[in-house]
Structures are given as C-alpha cells and as structure tokens.
A protein has these predicted regions:
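N-terminal module of bacterial RNA polymerase sigma factors
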Residues: 1-32, 112, 116, 126, ...
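Helix-turn-helix DNA-binding module
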Residues: 5, 132-169
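Conserved RNAP core-binding helix
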Residues: 10, 26-30, 34, 44-61, ...
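Sigma70-family region 2
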Residues: 15-16, 39-44, 53-70, 89-91
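Short, charged helix-capping/linker segments at alpha-helix termini
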Residues: 15-24, 34-53, 167, 188-189
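Structural recognition of an alpha-helix C-terminal capping motif at a helix-to-coil junction
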Residues: 49-56, 69-81
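Arg/Lys-rich amphipathic alpha helix in sigma70-family domain 2
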Residues: 60-67, 77-98, 124
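Acidic, proline/glycine-rich intrinsically disordered inter-domain spacer in sigma factors
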Residues: 103-133
Length: 189
C-alpha cells in the first residue's frame, strides 16, 4: 500500500514549481495548525491570520527548507514564531471558549447511535469544554508541549527543536501536563 508522498517530498515538489504539491501539504496540515493556534489562546480570526502568515512564510522559504528535520517540525517552528511575534508586548490573552463552543474544534467526538441522544450530546459537549478548560489552565510551556504533541503529532525530539528546550525538559513538561489533565478529567471517567 502506497501512502503517497511524504511532506518533505511535497515541499520539494512545490519548491520545484508543482502548485498541486503545496495544495496537498496545506490540506494535510491546515486544520491541525489552526487548532494549535486556537488552543494556544488565539481567537478564531486571529488564528486564521496567524495560519495565513505561517503558510506565507512556508511559501517564501520553501526553497530553503533542508530536510534534516521533519517538515512538521519546521512548520510548527514557523507557526510558533508567528504566534510569539504577535503576542510579544501584548497583555491581553484570549480565552479558548471559542474553540470549546465550536463543534468543529471540539477535542472529543462521540460517534454512534447513542450520540444522537440529547443527554449524551450535552454530556459530550460539557466534557469537551472541561477538557479545553483543563488544557487552557496548564502553564504556557506545558500547554505548548502538549498541543505540539496532541495537535501536531510531534515527537519529543521535534518538540524540543520547536520550543528550543532540552529533551528532558520537554519530557517533564509533557508528564506534568498529562498528570494535570488526568486529574482535571477524573470526574468524567
């Protein structure tokens, strides 16, 4: 079974002039990067702006990408830089409530006939809101590491590159984040 071209192959094809390759890359990563911005505290409109700035940087720098690291590591490094550039000097943080109330962005999805029951849907929405609030309550460094792993699918090593933190530091941040999230969600088990 052929899984198709890798992200790195698609970026190389785009750099060589294949616009369809960029379209496929964008399609693969647009939603996870958008959710990363939302979960980091950006309102939907700001997340969209940051997403576009991130992809513009990918377009401008596609020819310079050297596949020593995975494309996703590079992409989330660019995304993180765009977010930091935006928030630098700002005191106003935005709530993640927009993401919690948007059914397309809910972190949990219930599928099946039981999901059609209003009481089950209400519990599912409440549980999703509780989870988003628990993620939002994490210290920034722990939240970022968790989101890069959960939303971006990055490995410990890749998160260390993106956040410019040591491997053991990233491991600790993820461990503390998971402990806090498990504790916050105990009532939902």
């Amino acid at each position: 079974m052929n899984a198709g071209p890798t992200d790195e192959e698609l970026l190389a094809a785009y750099a060589a002039g294949d616009a369809r390759a960029f379209g496929e890359l964008y399609e693969r990563h647009e939603r996870p990067v958008f959710r990363y911005f939302l979960r980091q505290g950006a309102a939907a409109a700001l997340a969209e702006d940051l997403l576009q700035e991130t992809w513009m940087a990918v377009i401008r720098n596609a020819e310079r990408f050297e596949p020593r690291a995975k494309f996703t590591t590079w992409l989330y490094t660019v995304a993180r830089s765009k977010m930091i550039d935006h928030w630098r000097g700002k005191d106003d943080a935005v709530s993640l409530d927009d993401a919690a109330n948007d059914p397309d962005e809910a972190p949990l999805e219930v599928v099946g006939s039981e999901a059609d029951r209003p009481d089950v849907r209400a519990v599912s929405r409440a549980q999703a809101r509780a989870f988003v609030e628990a993620v939002e309550a994490l210290p920034a460094a722990q939240r970022e590491a968790f989101l890069l792993q959960a939303e971006g699918g990055l490995s410990l090593e890749e998160i260390a590159v993106v956040t410019q933190a040591g491997h053991e530091t990233v491991k600790s941040r993820l461990r503390y984040a998971m402990t806090k999230l498990r504790s916050a969600m105990e009532d939902w088990e």
